[in-house]
Design a protein with these regions (language model features):
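Short beta-strand segments
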Residues: 7-8, 71
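Extreme N-terminal starter segment of soluble prokaryotic enzymes
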Residues: 1-5
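Glycine-rich beta-alpha loop elements in corrinoid/cobalamin-binding modules
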Residues: 29, 36-118
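Short polar catalytic/cofactor-binding loops
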Residues: 8-14
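Glycine- and acidic-residue-enriched helix-capping/strand-helix junction motifs
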Residues: 15-30
Length: 118
């Protein structure tokens, strides 16, 4: 059973320069958090949006609700806000973490996030 879905707002399809270089990095922070949570008995799923699409993530959010954790940074702010809106449409509880949301918690809470980890 999945207690928590973790993702981030970076979609390689949206980054023309990175597509030319093609050296994206794995979401090590999300993977580390996932591993730690699993050792404590939580069911965790990681959706790596790097090679995914907004449509795939939206389909996953439509498939069932729960708790969604999203890593935030300045570059992914527009995508994260769209993810928050989509998740809330499908009754997910949204937890945000990372440098962007930690520096602007009020803005992210106003946009629909339930929790911002600082």
């Amino acid at each position: 059973m999945t207690d928590l879905l973790l993702t981030h707002g970076y979609f390689l399809r949206d980054d023309e320069k990175e597509r030319q270089i093609m050296k994206p990095y794995p979401p090590l922070g999300l993977l580390s958090l996932s591993a730690w949570l699993k050792t404590r008995g939580f069911g965790v799923e990681v959706y790596d949006s790097t090679f995914g699409s907004r449509d795939e993530l939206a389909a996953r959010l439509r498939a069932g609700s729960g708790v969604l954790g999203v890593y935030t940074n300045l570059m992914t702010r527009p995508a994260v806000l769209a993810i928050v809106a989509e998740a809330k449409r499908h009754r997910w509880q949204v937890v945000l973490g990372g440098p962007e949301s930690a520096n602007y918690p009020a803005e992210y809470l106003a946009a629909g996030a339930d929790v911002v980890v600082i």
